[in-house]
């Protein structure tokens, strides 16, 4: 387990007034989600990538990949109109992930935007953060009220950040 996930679990329990959730292992993640039915949890990118790939693997294996793609097209069209029906359209996916999952706080490594957007499209918000064990471990975190896809967010209130010798990208 990464320390970022542990801190995320502690914060979710304290700040969101819910019990934190940490799965036993990557191979047990779906079983644990269906046992404990968390609304949110903290994870490393590999866990999110694994969940996302399993969703598509299951759809393909069951011959429902085209249905899933059509559902995404409909859902994304509705979202452009300001109508959010993701959790209804993808209720089977949500139910297979414990039934309550709304958000995953992610950190410990880089998460490809493909997986962040993919999970969002199914109705599960990914909140990226950045940290290293030597820094508490959480340094920054994306926020629901100031969410920017592909970003690790802004510094936590207790942190000051300085980028030494920035390049053209920052």
Can you describe what each PLM-predicted range is?
Residues 41, 79, 85-170:
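Conserved AMP-binding/adenylate-forming
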Residues 1-2, 24, 133, 143:
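Short, flexible loop/turn elements at secondary-structure junctions
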Residues 2-90:
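Conserved AMP-binding/adenylation subdomain of ANL enzymes
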